[in-house]
Amino acid sequence: MDKHRFLVVVLAVLVQLAAVFGAARAESTTPENSDYSQPRLPVLVETTMDLGLSSARGRDQRSVPPTPVVLGIYQPSFPNDLSQLSDYERRSGRKIPIIHWYAQWGGWKSAFDRNDLEAVSARGSLPMITWEPWTGSAQGQPEPNWSLRNGILSGRFDAYIDSWARGMAAYGKPVLLRFAHEMHDHPFYPWAVGINGNSAEDYLTAWRYVRGIFARSNATNVHWIWNPHVIAGASESTYESTYRALYPGDSEVDWVGLDVYNTGPDLDWGSARWQSLAQVLSTPYRAITAVSSKGLLLPEVGSTENGGSKSQWITTALTTELAQFPRVRALVWFDVDKEQQWNLNSSQSALQSWVAAAAQPRLSADVSMFLLS
């Protein structure tokens, strides 16, 4: 490389660094860019500029390593009983970084319990809580008392929300909180748009209302997940318009989420056919990444045994297909025998596939790297 070319390259790199750090500083000091989330580290933009360091055979063609993905598991016994995790971890030789459970405002795990969070943190894992404003006992029923206007927006739950906000702030360590998920036209959930007279504006107002209570308690350790659901057979434009109408905005959200199920031929809320993870995820992924700039989590993932090889589904999903979706940063398995045998030990071959895939270096990212990304 001649001296003139070297100086040009150095100048270009310095300009890029100045732009990145200048943007980061502006973001941290401009009121309209402030939000309730923790400060995030600035990420340097990669440069593809040829610095003249390639070999005589041409430029280095090595690919950039895929983005690390953090694994997690949900089981109905969590967080009270974490014993099943020990077997999974012993088999794979890896800790499960994310432990997921559900908390219903009027039912299971209603009260904030710091002991649950401490137990998960003590084992080196990150808590993920799906926080549901309902009783959980009347699935398929509207529960009009839990509509957004009769519930959250009436102020009826302010003291309850505040108890969680203050508890989270006192706990102080990171928590992933998935609030009021799958919020569009879902017949199960009284907070969903189209149920109990809830509108998109009601949902957006409720989201910001709850976040505001957490902000006043300085619960900045909470990472908020906005998680719509996958609409079987919908077009990309339908997905995008639906998501856009319900998205609170990047300043109100830390992560976005999508739930991915291979329902096979048996469930009418699925595709009624066997689908790979890539087939289920591709269209909603394009839509949600067009609507939001945030990283994507998959808080519920499962496959049936009926209609194909679940073992192969797991292997392909975790070893090959995830790389097609670079914004995905976590995959949490729905380890439950429920509508289908979503559970990992539904067959010995399925469990063996999970154990083998979970041992990949790409799927062993630690939680600190995940939170700073």
Task: Give the location of each predicted region.
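N-terminal substrate-binding region of glycoside hydrolase catalytic domains
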Residues: 57-159, 303-306, 332
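Substrate-binding cleft of secreted/luminal carbohydrate-active enzymes
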Residues: 63-76, 295-373
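Hydrophobic faces of well-ordered beta-strands that scaffold small-molecule active sites
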Residues: 71-73, 97-101, 127-129, 175-179, ...
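Substrate-binding cleft of extracellular glycoside hydrolase catalytic domains
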Residues: 108, 115-222, 226
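Glycoside hydrolase catalytic-domain groove-lining segments
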Residues: 111-132, 251-307
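Aromatic-lined carbohydrate-recognition surfaces of secreted/lumenal glycan-active proteins
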Residues: 214-240, 293-306, 333
